[in-house]
Amino acid sequence: MKKLIYYFGSNGSDGNASMKNILGNKGAGLAEMSNLKLPIPDGFTITTELCNYFYTHNNNFPKNFQSDLKKAITELEIITGKIFGSTSNPLLLSVRSGSKVSMPGMMDTILNLGMNNEVCNALADSCGDKRFALDSYKRFLEMYGSTVLSIPSDLFEQICEKHKMQADIHKDSDITVELLEKIIDDFKRLHIKYTKQLINDPYEQLESAIKAVLHSWMSNRAVIYRKINNISEDCGTAINIQAMVFGNLGKTSATGVAFTRSPSTGEKKLFGEFLINAQGEDIVSGTRTPMPIIANDSNSMQAMMPEVFKELSQIAQKLEEHYLDMQDIEFTIENNKLYILQTRTAKRTAIAAINIAVQMVEEKLISKEQALMRIDPESLNQLLHTRIDYSKGLTSIAEGLPASPGAATGIAVFSPYDAEKLSHHHKVILVRHDTSPEDINGMHVSSGIVTIRGGMTSHAAVVARGMGKPCVCGTSNLSIDEKKQILTAGDIVIKQGDIITIDGGSGKIFLGEMPLIQPTFSEESKLILDWADEISSLKVRANAETVNDALVSVKFGAQGIGLCRSEHMFFDKNKIPLVRDMIIAPDIERRKLAVQKLLPLQTEDFKALFRVMKDKPVNIRLLDPPLHEFLPTTEEDKKNLANSLNLPLSMINQRLHAMHEVNPMLGHRGCRLGICSPEIYQMQIEAIFTAIFELHKKEHIECNLELMIPLISNVGEIQKLKMDIYAVIEKLEQRYRYKFSFTLGTMIELPRAALGSKKIAKEVDYFSFGTNDLTQTTYGISRDDIASFLPYYLEEKIFESDPFTTLDEEGVGELIDIAIKRGKSSNANLKLGACGEHAGNPASIEFFHRMNLNYVSCSPYRIPIARIAAAQAKIKHG
C-alpha cells in the first residue's frame, strides 16, 4: 500500500503544491504553506488513495491504517505539546475534506473533534473560560451529530431556538453558561435518541469522522455539483486533520476569509470578511453576517485588529506572488495570533478573471498565454449578464450585499423543490434564510438567489459566482416565512409567484419587473479577446441570418458568417404567405409567380446582411428544411391560405396530406428540394447574386460570398446542382455584364457524404461539417427526442456526455477525420469549417483545432467563448 499520511506544519512538510492528485487541493496548499514557513496549525493529510481504497473495498480501511493513524496523532501530540483525549491538556482536531478540484461547501467538515465531558472541563480549566469550552462542545455535538450520525441539522437549531426563546435571548453571543449546559444536555439526548449511545471515545470519533468525510464524496449534493461542473468522480477526496485553533476564545479571537483581489471585479486590494469570537463554519455557512476586512468604518479588521491585519496583508501578497494567481485564504485568529488554515486559487466572476489576467500580464507576473489559459471559456456567459436601467428612477424595496453580479427577474420561490418544479415554466428567484449544499439543484435552475443571512463569502455567494448567477446576501431588512411562503419588506408582502427583480451588482431588490440593459464588453475583455485572436489559428465565425444577428456577431468579434440559414428569412410575416403560395400552388405557373414575388424580398435580405459584414466571408446555405415546416397547421391559417390562392379548403387539405412525410428530417429536404423543385434554388441564386451586383455598383461594397449546398450524400447530387447553379449565374453575368467571384461548398452532415468525400471534394472549394445532423444520423437519435432517455444514459454512464453538446470524437469525430483525409487527398486546397452546436463548445473546439479546420461557426452569443477556446486549443496543442 502506498504512503497514506503526509505531515505538514511548523516542522515543514512531506508534500508540496504539485501533489494535488494525492493530497487534494487543500492538502497540497497546506504542504506548500508549510514550506513557505507560514503560520499554519500543525497536522497531516490522509491521501486520496484512502478514498479510492475505501470505495473499492466495501467501505473498509486498509490493514495497517488504524495503527498509522495513531502514529500520526502521537506525532501531532509531540509537536503541539497537547494530548488527544487528555483530561488535563487536551488536543482537539478539525477534520476537513479536500479533493483535487475545489468544491466549496459540498463536502463535510467536523470541528472540535475529541470532545466529551471530561475534555470539556479540562479545556475550560486550561484556558480559564468555561463559556468558550461549552460553546466548543456544543458546536462539536451539532457538527458531529449532523455530519457523522446523520441527525437532521434543523433539530439542533430547533433546540437552540427553544432555549433562546425561553430565556428571551436573541443573539448567540448572549447565551449564558447555564443555557449552554442545558442545550448540550438536549443535544446529548438527541444523539442517544438517534444512535442509542453517546460516542465519547476520541479515536472512535476520529475514525467515524474520517468515514463520514469519505461518504460525503458520494453524497447527493457532491455528485450533483460534480456533474454541473464536469468534475471526475474518480479523483476522490483527501482528508486534512489539524490541531484546532480557536477563533471563539473572545474578543481577541476571530475567523475569516480573505481574497487577494476582489472576486467580483478583480480590483487589486485585499477583500474579505471576518467574525469576532467565531469558528470557521460560522462564516462560510452564512448563518451570521460578517464584518469587512477593509472598510472606512470602525467595524473593519483594519480598524479593530491593525497588527493582525498588517500580517494578513503581507501573507496574502506573499501567497499571490508565490502561486502567481489570486488566492482565497481561510484564517483564524486565536488571542491575536494569526493562523492560515487554507489557501487555494480563488473562484471568481468572468469579469474578475479577465481583469486579473490582464493586470498580471501588465505586472509581468504571467504571459499572455498563461492569462488566456486561466479564463474558463464558459464563464464568459457572465459577460452577457443584463443590468438594471437606473435612469428610470427606480425605488428598491430592500438592499443587501452585492454577492454576485448581474440582474435577474423572476417569480419568488422559497424552496429548492419549488424552484426545480416551477423553473420549467417560469424564471425563478430562489429566496432563502441561507443556502446549504443540499440546495444545489434549486440554485442551478434559478435565475437569481437571495438570502436573508450570510455575507460575500457565504455558501450562496460562492456558488452563485461560480454559476454566474446574480445573488444578493445579508438582506437583514427582509423577513421570510418559508412555511407560509411569504417575504416581508416593511409593509410590503411578497407571496410565492410574485415577480421580483434583483441586482447582484448593487445588492438591491425590487418588486416587479424592472427595465434591463444589455451589457457591453470592457476594455480588458476586448484586450484579452484580441490576444486570443493573435494566438489562435482557428477562426471564429457566426451563425447569422438577420441584420441583428450580424450586428451582434461583429460586436463580439466574428470573422465572418459561417452559416446563413436562408430559410429563416422565409419565416418573416411578409414572406411566409408567399412561401406557402409557392409550395401549395397547383401548377408550375402559379409556383413561378409566387417565386418571382419572393425574389425582390430575398434580394433585400441578402443586401442587408452583406452591408453589415462588408468584405468578411458570408457562407449562405441554400434552402434546407422540408417544406412542411412552412405550411399552416391551424384551421385559421389553412383558411387564409385557401382564400389567398382562391382555392377550396378541401384542395388545400388534400395538398397538405399529399406532402406529409413519415420522417421528414430524412425525407424531401436539402439538396433533394433543389433537384426536384429547381425554381426555389434558382430564385435564391438570383437573389444572392443580384444583391452582390447592386451593392458593388451602387454602394461600392465588395461581397465575399461562400455558397453552400446542404444534405449531400452522393456526388451525383452535387454535380447536378452545380450545373443548375452555374447556368443561373452565367445568365446573370450576361444580364449585368459582371463577373462574379465566389466559392462553392457543401455541408458534410451525413455518414455517406463523409465516406464519399474524396469524390465530393473534387466538385467543391470547401466542406462545412454540420455536426448536428451528422450526430443524429450517426447515432440514429433525434436531437428533439433524446431528452426522454439522455438523463438515464448519463446516470448509467452509457454516454459520458450529451453527444449534441460535446462532439463524440470516437464515432462522429472519426467520420470527420475520414472526410478530411479523403477530401484533402483529391483536393489539397479544400477549406474546412464546422457549423453545428458543437462549434461553440470548448471541448469540441479543441477537437476541431486538432483536425486542422480553418474555422468554426457558432451562435453570436457563443463567439467570445469560442475565441478563448480556440486560443487555448492552440496553446495546448500548437
Curated annotation (Swiss-Prot):
Where are the annotated segments for Central? Answer: 405-502
GO molecular function list: ATP binding; kinase activity; metal ion binding; pyruvate, phosphate dikinase activity
Q: Which family does it belong to?
A: Belongs to the PEP-utilizing enzyme family.
Species name:
Rickettsia conorii (strain ATCC VR-613 / Malish 7)
Q: What else is known?
A: The reaction takes place in three steps, each mediated by a carrier histidine residue located on the surface of the central domain. The two first partial reactions are catalyzed at an active site located on the N-terminal domain, and the third partial reaction is catalyzed at an active site located on the C-terminal domain. For catalytic turnover, the central domain swivels from the concave surface of the N-terminal domain to that of the C-terminal domain.
Name under which the protein is recorded: Pyruvate, phosphate dikinase
What quaternary structure, including any partners, is listed in this protein's UniProt entry? Homodimer.
What positions constitute the catalytic site?
459, 835
Residues the entry annotates as binding ATP = 96
Q: How is its activity regulated?
A: Activated by light-induced dephosphorylation. Inhibited by dark-induced phosphorylation. Both reactions are catalyzed by PDRP1.
Can you quote the domain comment?
Answer: The N-terminal domain contains the ATP/Pi active site, the central domain the pyrophosphate/phosphate carrier histidine, and the C-terminal domain the pyruvate active site.
Per its database record, what is this protein's job? Answer: Catalyzes the reversible phosphorylation of pyruvate and phosphate.
Reaction catalysed by this enzyme: pyruvate + phosphate + ATP = phosphoenolpyruvate + AMP + diphosphate + H(+)
Q: Does the keyword Cell wall biogenesis/degradation apply?
A: no
Post-translational note: Phosphorylation of Thr-457 in the dark inactivates the enzyme. Dephosphorylation upon light stimulation reactivates the enzyme.
Q: Which residues form a coiled coil?
A: none
